[in-house]
Amino acid sequence: ACVLKGSSEAEQSNRAAIRIIQQVLKKNGLPAAVVTLLPSERETVQELFTATQYVDVLIPRGSDGLIRYVRQNSLVPVIETGAGVCHVYVEKKADINKAVNITVNAKVSRPSVCNAMDALLVDQSIAAAFLKKLQPALGQYQVEIFADAAAYKILKGYPHLRRATLADFGREFLDLKCAVKVVKDSAEAVDHIRKYSTRHSEAIVTEDKKQAEYFLHEVDAAAVYHNASTRFTDGEEFGLGAEIGISTQKLHARGPFALEKLVTEKWVIRGNGQVR
């Protein structure tokens, strides 16, 4: 059975969705009650946290604060659909046009989702050429940039430029905003990602296969990309069907997951008197 608990803001929409689901279940000879909507009051969540006899797993979907609250208070196992502080690293041997297209897509195609880019890292040897070409592309969408000292110097004159603080590099903006940092090399980029990443989706743009493999091997994330946008981290895109969430933990599921990850195994052994 599946028990759903939605927010009060979407209560009418949730009820409508449940009605449709239950109608389909009945039409196919299944009991409608296998999918149930709980009242939106907060007290019902507290009861779920301790219902270890009846509930196998909780999957919180929502803000980082909500997910953290569920994880810290639940006695029932939790699959975290964590926040995404996602990075794109433009390495010194990147194709600049390709890097601009990937960066713009990762940031602006849908900025309010967890697989959107939040921080851009650029190799110092390509920073000036790349950022000057990226500037009008992001400016077209009025993207607000929080730049470190080196990037700020290059981007000076960009109308939506701000000086970055350390906190900006760990922010999930969920908006047309991003942090930009110039790094010395791939090692510094990887170290930065290790410090600030939520282990969701991380990308490198480069034509150097050795540097790409180094990045893909060293970065610990549910999805790592070479020359592609972080926006592909999605159940439908990965061929999994309807997505339940994107997990940033390593157990029980990691990355985009669908119904298959919510089933387990049962061993059935038929014998004829065998003993051990």
Describe the residue ranges of each PLM region:
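Rossmann-like NAD(P) dinucleotide-binding subdomain of oxidoreductase/dehydrogenase enzymes
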Residues: 1-93, 97
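Short, small-residue-enriched loops and turns at beta-alpha junctions
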Residues: 9-14, 153-154, 233
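General structural feature for long, well-ordered alpha-helical segments within catalytic domains
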Residues: 13, 17, 40, 44, ...
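Flexible, glycine/charged-enriched surface loops at secondary-structure junctions
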Residues: 29-35, 111-116, 142-150, 201-205, ...
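Short, hydrophobic beta-strand segments that form beta-sheet elements in well-ordered domains
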Residues: 38, 58-59, 144-148, 181-184, ...
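Short, structured coil segments at secondary-structure junctions
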Residues: 54, 74, 141, 219-220, ...
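ALDH superfamily catalytic-core signature
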Residues: 67-175, 226
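Conserved C-terminal structural/oligomerization subdomain of aldehyde/semialdehyde dehydrogenase
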Residues: 165-276
